[in-house]
Amino acid sequence: LGLVRPVGSEDEARTIIAACKKQYHDARHNCWCYLLRDGTERYSDDGEPQGTAGIPMLEVFRRAGVTNVVCVVTRYFGGVLLGTGGLLRAYTAAAADALADAGISEVRRWLACEVSTPYALYEPVRAAVAALGGVVQETQYAAAVTICALLPEEAGEVFAAQVRDLTAGRCAVRPVGETERAVPLAGAGL
């Protein structure tokens, strides 16, 4: 069994590891690793021969360039001794499969903004958000349509110019803050 979860701290990683160990307390081994953006890396072979579980799992994430992640691989003994090479391959494959199933996301800075527009211009403004890789989070319908959107930070000025052009200067983008958000990377399979 392989589990991959995003984490922001060692405490969060350790909490997930402890929960897995508790859930699968009857398993022979709950091997784990985690990597954080600040360079922190930890791993455990959890009773497997040294170097056959934690480090190979860690290498999967290093090669993928992934950080802020925890991985736990739970192994039940099936009656066949795998040997060190077999264990290394099994833990590497389990970590890689779990990562592929979870997918890879990139944490980016986003600009939160609002645009109030006449109903007739709603669709072109919404399409401009999507074309720049943004996301419409909320749409409020009143005398005008207010679009609450998140845009990649670097697209803010381009979006403001597009809104001015689309609305002939009748509407403006109002920044309301910034946030960080994970975005799935296309084609990030292993």
Region roles according to the model:
Residues 103-121, 149:
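Short glycine-/aliphatic-rich beta-strand segments at the starts of folded cytosolic domains
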Residues 39, 52-66, 141-143:
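Positively charged, aromatic-enriched nucleic acid-contacting surfaces
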Residues 149-152, 156:
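Terminal, non-globular segments
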Residues 57-101:
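Active-site beta-strand/loop microenvironment that shapes enzyme catalytic pockets
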